[in-house]
Regions:
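Alpha-solenoid helical-repeat scaffold
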Residues: 1-224
């Protein structure tokens, strides 16, 4: 999953950091669907693999953009994607505080940016599929956008069910999420099967039994 997260981050940034080619709204719709499926079958590994690149993407697309309509809508779609995945994570892990945060600070400004994937024919169609690119649209600018990263990290790290299934404590999760992540970091994580390391605290924290509706135990914690 670390490798997939790195590829998704690079794809999301194509056209922003790399102007030779650009991702499309369809790419974001499909990435959102893929992450949704992963979080259903591997919620713990999915959080560990995808949260660091999400936080990196949030920071990289927080600056204002006014110069180019395509860049404006690409930037806004990146911000929508970050919020959409955090909403999925919060639903899976029943983290209501993050859902409330997104409802107040995220949805009112970015709900219109949700991309859609093209409908595919039930039968084989040899004609090329028209994939729309970023261009002019609803917005003329992408104003500066500040995510409350410390709050998001604190809320996820304090989730007792996540601590239990990841076999670490809140301090360990905070250290994992606070890392300076890059796509290259994700590839190294994949090569080394990296995961959070238990960090002792001065005040021991008992890992209480997870809520009855928490994600089921996963057969493997390998997040490569």
């Amino acid at each position: 999953l670390h490798t997939l997260a790195s590829h998704m981050h690079r794809l999301a940034m194509q056209g922003l950091s790399d102007t030779t080619k650009s991702s499309t709204p369809t790419d974001f719709a499909l990435m959102n669907h893929v992450v949704h499926m992963i979080l259903q079958v591997a919620p713990t590994a999915g959080v560990l693999a995808f949260v660091p690149p999400l936080l990196a993407l949030a920071q990289e697309t927080s600056a204002p953009v006014v110069s180019n309509a395509a860049l404006v809508h690409h930037t806004l779609t990146c911000r929508w994607f970050v919020g959409a995945v955090f909403a999925q994570i919060s639903n899976v892990w029943q983290q209501q505080s993050i859902l409330d945060y997104l409802h107040v600070h995220h949805e009112p400004t970015l709900r219109d940016m949700a991309p859609t994937a093209p409908d595919l024919s039930d039968s084989y169609d040899p004609s090329p599929l028209e994939i729309p690119h970023f261009g002019s649209g609803l917005y003329s600018e992408a104003p500066a956008y500040a995510w409350d990263t410390p709050f998001l990290i604190e809320a996820l790290s304090s989730n007792l069910a996540l601590q239990k299934l990841a076999h670490v404590n809140a301090k360990s999760l905070q250290s994992w999420f606070q890392r300076q992540w890059t796509a290259s970091t994700g590839e190294v994580d994949a090569a080394t099967s990296a995961r959070p390391i238990f960090v002792p605290t001065t005040t021991p924290q008992g890992l209480s039994r997870a809520p009855s509706m928490s994600p089921s135990d996963e057969t493997s914690m390998d997040v490569r």
